[in-house]
Amino acid sequence: MSLPNSSCLLEDKMCEGNKTTMASPQLMPLVVVLSTISLVTVGLNLLVLYAVRSERKLHTVGNLYIVSLSVADLIVGAVVMPMNILYLLMSKWSLGRPLCLFWLSMDYVASTASIFSVFILCIDRYRSVQQPLRYLKYRTKTRASATILGAWFLSFLWVIPILGWNHFRQQISVRREDKCETDFYDVTWFKVMTAIINFYLPTLLMLWFYAKIYKAVQKHCQHRELINGSLPSFSEIKLRPENPKGDAKKPGKESPWEVLKRKPKDAGGGSVLKSPSQTPKEMKSPVVFSQEDDGEVDKLHCFPLDIVQMQTVAEGSSRDYVAINQSHGQLKTDEQGLNTHGASEISEDQMLGDSQSFSRTDSDTTTETAPGKGKLRSGSNTGLDYIKFTWKRLRSHSRQYVSGLHMNRERKAAKQLGFIMAAFILCWIPYFIFFMVIAFCKNCCNEHLHMFTIWLGYINSTLNPLIYPLCNENFKKTFKRILHIRS
């Protein structure tokens, strides 16, 4: 594939009959515009790289692909564009063959690396959406870095034909000293083959991947709506027995990810908390909460799930018990009762791991409660069934909640990928269509149109860093902070 370079603009064989000579004064406005584009491209991509380096929130696996794309775009803006402008001004190449080969190599390598970076970014988003939980274990910075290095290695393979084409051919190509062009500029089969491998095939695969991503996200959203419509929402779940007395919902209920807490009441008929003789650190048996006629948990505090384990529930005396085991964590008391040890927010990874630890203890426990109030007994079928039901529901909703968080993030990432792909295709496809036409019809080249398609492809490197803050709130905030822009 002849990735964008301006050699065709001056190649008599490729553009013969349509070539026009432009005077330098006429070129100056165009040179100013193109130079501005080059400077903006360099500045924006440097801003992206600095933002990722300086902001910890941007240190993610997915942004490694963005860094790769930004490096490729930076090379286009800092090396390829300026030398193209210089070649356009001179109307002939007078900088020598070594510098010509360097420019051609940077042009082909950077443009291919940009295409491949978008491609592997698309694959990453596809696997994140299609296999979220499985791919999370596989999706590491080491593997992502290896994939990126592989993409750049394939891109650098362009150096072989650029520098050594004549070494692989018996016939030596005629080289024009005042032109900067590859030795295979007139080899149709090679250019068509590489165009298919480097652009058309990756583009078709990316469109297929993105269609799958779109369908998966859409299907997940429909599934979530169906679940939310048929089951109580995650925030509405309460640990309570299914009896008529406990059906009335109390105002001000808090999140289900909070551990049970009841204040003792002076008057009868209220709930009673049996205070253990040991401190929470010293407790070896579960802390048991008793509850009277209302049959409903008063308050839940945010605990990591691995310290919460459901025990058997006593039957009789209109009480229901929920036990909290401390085998995996320490509880901290305050004047109001039990509180958390500072876990107000549960991360996605914690929930994935903790949901496995949220389970019923293996052994039955018998514990005395307040005098005259009843006893916690093993073998309570009704209570045990309720505990099992509650555990299954909490586990199911925790997984749905984690899956929802992950899919929410991936939906935003898919949106970002959609904009990147749209810009990529719109900017590059005119050049490659025109390129295929020229490959089969050497007299069909129009100098001005071909130059326009080349620079349209280059402008893709300018647009990419503008897309990131539009689709990513962290990029937007970081850009504003770096540029000292107030919201």
From Swiss-Prot:
Name the InterPro entries for this protein.
Answer: GPCR_Rhodpsn, GPCR_Rhodpsn_7TM, Histamine_H1_rcpt
Membrane topology (Extracellular) = 1-29, 90-97, 165-188, 441-446
Molecular function, one GO term: G protein-coupled serotonin receptor activity
The record's annotation in Pfam families points to: 7tm_1
Binding residues annotated for histamine, in chain numbering: D107, T112, N198, Y431
Question: Where do the record's glycosylation annotations fall on this chain?
Answer: N5, N18
Compositional bias, Basic and acidic residues, is annotated for 238-261
Q: Which SUPFAM superfamilies match?
A: Family A G protein-coupled receptor-like
UniProt membrane topology term? Multi-pass membrane protein
General function of this protein: G-protein-coupled receptor for histamine, a biogenic amine that functions as an immune modulator and a neurotransmitter. Through the H1 receptor, histamine mediates the contraction of smooth muscles and increases capillary permeability due to contraction of terminal venules. Also mediates neurotransmission in the central nervous system and thereby regulates circadian rhythms, emotional and locomotor activities as well as cognitive functions.
Q: What is this protein called?
A: Histamine H1 receptor
One GO cellular component this record assigns the protein to is: synapse
List localization entries.
Cell membrane
Q: Which UniProt keywords apply?
A: Cell membrane, Disulfide bond, G-protein coupled receptor, Glycoprotein, Membrane, Phosphoprotein, Receptor, Transducer, Transmembrane, Transmembrane helix
List the disulfide bonds in this chain. Answer: C100-C180, C441-C444
Give the family, as the similarity comment puts it. Belongs to the G-protein coupled receptor 1 family.
The PTM entry states: Phosphorylation at sites in the second and third cytoplasmic loops independently contribute to agonist-induced receptor down-regulation.
Comment, domains = Histamine activates the receptor by forming hydrogen bonds with transmembrane domains 3 and 6, squashing the ligand-binding pocket on the extracellular side and opening the cavity for G-protein engagement on the intracellular side.
